[in-house]
């Protein structure tokens, strides 16, 4: 799996969709996946706070694998690599896998 990380507006979603098409693999934009689960991101953060957003966003990432979507390319949310280590029980493992390219 290829995970695209970077700041908002960097082109992760655009490049991710093109790359997935070229490789003929599924593409998931984590922000869109999150919004499909719980609604508008800004409203969610305003209502529940950033820590809750981080926890739910990590859960959305984990759900990709439970739901057997298993994308070939995933565009991560802009702050995904900056969450607190205790944001979610799986976050430490996920972050290490991303950093190590697993």
Mark where each language-model region is.
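The conserved Walker
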Residues: 8
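Walker A/P-loop
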Residues: 13
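Conserved substrate/cofactor phosphate-moiety recognition/catalytic segment
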Residues: 17, 21-60
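Conserved nucleotide-sensing/catalytic segment adjacent to the nucleotide-binding pocket
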Residues: 43-85
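ATP-dependent NMP and nucleoside kinases share a basic, alpha-helical "lid"
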Residues: 77-102
């Amino acid at each position: 799996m290829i995970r695209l990380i970077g700041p908002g507006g960097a082109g992760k979603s655009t490049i991710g969709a093109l790359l997935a098409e070229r490789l003929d693999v599924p593409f998931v934009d984590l922000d869109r996946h999150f919004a499909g689960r719980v609604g508008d991101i800004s409203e969610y953060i305003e209502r529940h706070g950033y820590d809750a957003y981080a926890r739910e966003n990590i859960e959305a990432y984990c759900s990709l694998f439970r739901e057997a979507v298993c994308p070939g390319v995933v565009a991560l949310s802009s702050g995904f690599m900056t969450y607190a280590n205790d944001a979610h029980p799986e976050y430490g493992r996920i972050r290490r896998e991303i950093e190590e390219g697993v």
